[in-house]
């Protein structure tokens, strides 16, 4: 779904290895995660229009799915969110589609 424009903020750091934060954007989008096999992790990709490869992302799954965790989030290509899911259970997990919150930080 469309998001608002990047909100401009500037943060002061200690100067040496700082990367200025130029803004952030919050997306809410329905993601339909494919089944994740037992005792494994798997990366899946989703289209999120507006993401750039230089963005850093934080993703919030809206509900608890026993045995399933989101263990990594990255922008793998322009407009593409890559999420790694870990299944710690003894059986496959196929979660229902949900509205995830994706916060992108632009540097």
Residue ranges: model-predicted function:
Residues 77-79:
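Residue-level recognition of beta-strand termini and adjacent short loop/turns
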Residues 2-51, 81, 91-107:
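Extracellular receptor-binding modules and their adjoining Ser/Thr/Gly/Asp/Asn-rich linkers
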Residues 70-75:
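Glycan-recognition/cleft segments
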Residues 85-89:
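Asparagine-centered strand-capping/turn motif at beta-strand->loop junctions
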Residues 64-67, 91:
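Extended, low-complexity, turn-rich repeat/linker tracts enriched in Gly/Pro/Ser/Thr and Asp/Glu
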